[in-house]
Every structure is written in structure tokens, then in C-alpha cells.
Amino acid sequence: MAEQLNSLEELGTVAKTEAAAPVHVQKLDAQGRAYATGKRKDAVARVWVKPGTGKITVNDKEFEKYFARPVLQMILQQPIVASNRAGQFDIVATVAGGGLSGQAGAVRHGISKALTYYEPGLRTVLKKGGFLTRDSRVVERKKYGKAKARRSFQFSKR
């Protein structure tokens, strides 16, 4: 603390002057879009959100074509459904690295962050759903003297 305290009464006045929680403001670029990056495993997604008809494009393809499995499509739409904003935003994403599952998670993370930048009021809903938290689980590295990260080579007693 910068100030020196001489008595307990002064401590009470200093504690009351603490700043309030930060107010989140809308962050848009020159075209009126919200931009965010999402990450999952080795995948990194760059996501732009703007008002529109609900069209989602991933790497210049419709998301139904890029993510053919219904589970991955559902993962992608979770933040939009949770915030009741289906059909209100056009989403453009470019994603690279990792496999399809990691890429779907990265796009979901990016969509969630971009929605909060566009509409800060959605932050509580998306935070409660766990969409704003970066899933930090990555593949454990292989160790020498082992077949994989934890799997040992076959042991022969004799």
C-alpha cells in the first residue's frame, strides 16, 4: 500500500475506498465486429462475431460441412444456445492446429469470448456454463524408458 497507516480508524477509511469490480465494456473493431481467439489442446481459433442471420462459417466452409459429426456441431452451438442468441449473429472463424475435436472446442471458446466482447451482459451466463474458461488439458509428454506417457514396456520376470 502506498499510504502509511497510523491507527485502526484510518484502516477502515482506506478499506472503504477500494475500487469496485471492473465494468466490462463492448469491444468492437472498425467494421462493428467483435474479435476473440479461442484455444483448446493444440488448436487455435480466430473468431469474428457481427449482427446477422445466424450463419456460421469455419475456414470458408459452412460449419455443418467442416464439422460433419453432430457432436462437434452441438459443441460449436453451445454458447449461442445458452445465451439465447440463435439466429442473431453471423460468425466467421478460422481455426488451425490439432484435430477436429480440439478445433471445435477452440471455436466454441472463441465464440464465447467474442459474444462477451459484443454483449458484456452475456458474461455471467457464459461463465456459469463454463464456456469462457480455457480448458488447459493437453497431451502428456512421452517419457524415455516408457512406451508412451505412462505405459511401460512389457516386463518379463525370467
From Swiss-Prot:
GO terms for molecular function: RNA binding; structural constituent of ribosome. Pfam families: Ribosomal_S9. One of its GO terms (cellular component) is cytosolic small ribosomal subunit. Keywords: Ribonucleoprotein, Ribosomal protein. One of its GO terms (biological process) is translation. It comes from the Bacteria. InterPro entries: Ribosomal_Su5_D2-typ_SF, Ribosomal_uS9, Ribosomal_uS9_bac/plastid, Ribosomal_uS9_CS, Ribsml_uS5_D2-typ_fold_subgr. SUPFAM superfamilies: Ribosomal protein S5 domain 2-like (SSF54211). Belongs to the universal ribosomal protein uS9 family. HAMAP family: Ribosomal_uS9_B. This is Small ribosomal subunit protein uS9. It comes from Brucella anthropi (strain ATCC 49188 / DSM 6882 / CCUG 24695 / JCM 21032 / LMG 3331 / NBRC 15819 / NCTC 12168 / Alc 37).
